[in-house]
């Protein structure tokens, strides 16, 4: 009998874009694949990716990830030129792509990268259809978050 693969310790999350949830209302989320080169996969396994300043552009019926940085490893092959900030093609189904194109063309909407993670040894990117927040919306979110923490603190001390 074959042995089952043991799950690797640690989180499946590679990178998060926390700023996206602070600056945008995320209305719809999509899971996409990434078209990567070999050295990029190695740097993802080492956790050397940054998607905090990244965004998605739709061109010629395809989606591309711009602004992300994959730091090349020092042990990477010398005959391959590593470009850490190159644009990467996103792998979406035609129906999902049509939905994104239709909704992103409305005023005030954009597509942002939310998180990057491993799913069955495949690198996946979660993207979101987003609408920008105003300053008062951001303040309301901070107020709600602080009240939630205070409420939990009060309940904890009340139960003693």
Swiss-Prot record:
Keyword Electron transport: no
Subcellular location: Cytoplasm
Main location: cytoplasm
Transmembrane segments: none
Keyword Cytoplasm included in the entry's annotation: yes
Record SUPFAM superfamilies: Small protein B (SmpB)
Regions annotated as coiled coil: none
GO terms for MF: RNA binding
Annotated GO CC locations: cytosol
Keywords: Cytoplasm, RNA-binding
Pfam families, sorted: SmpB (PF01668)
Biological-process GO terms, alphabetical: trans-translation
Family: Belongs to the SmpB family.
Physiological role: Required for rescue of stalled ribosomes mediated by trans-translation. Binds to transfer-messenger RNA (tmRNA), required for stable association of tmRNA with ribosomes. tmRNA and SmpB together mimic tRNA shape, replacing the anticodon stem-loop with SmpB. tmRNA is encoded by the ssrA gene; the 2 termini fold to resemble tRNA(Ala) and it encodes a 'tag peptide', a short internal open reading frame. During trans-translation Ala-aminoacylated tmRNA acts like a tRNA, entering the A-site of stalled ribosomes, displacing the stalled mRNA.
The protein's name in its UniProt record: SsrA-binding protein
Organism the protein comes from: Erwinia tasmaniensis (strain DSM 17950 / CFBP 7177 / CIP 109463 / NCPPB 4357 / Et1/99)
């Amino acid at each position: 009998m074959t042995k089952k693969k043991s799950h690797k310790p640690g989180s499946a999350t590679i990178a998060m874009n926390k700023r996206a949830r602070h600056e945008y209302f995320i209305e719809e989320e999509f899971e996409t694949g990434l078209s990567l080169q070999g050295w990029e996969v190695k740097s993802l396994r080492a956790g050397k990716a940054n998607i905090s300043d990244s965004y998605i552009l739709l061109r010629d019926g395809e989606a591309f990830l711009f602004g992300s940085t994959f730091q090349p490893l020092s042990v990477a092959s010398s005959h391959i030129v590593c470009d850490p900030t190159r644009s990467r093609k996103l792998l979406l189904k035609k129906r999902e792509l049509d939905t994104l194109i239709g909704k992103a063309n409305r005023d005030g909407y954009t597509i942002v990268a939310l998180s990057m993670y491993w799913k069955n040894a495949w690198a996946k990117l979660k993207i979101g259809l987003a609408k920008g927040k105003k300053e008062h919306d951001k303040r309301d979110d901070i107020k709600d978050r602080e009240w939630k923490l205070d409420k939990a603190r009060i309940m904890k001390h009340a139960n003693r």
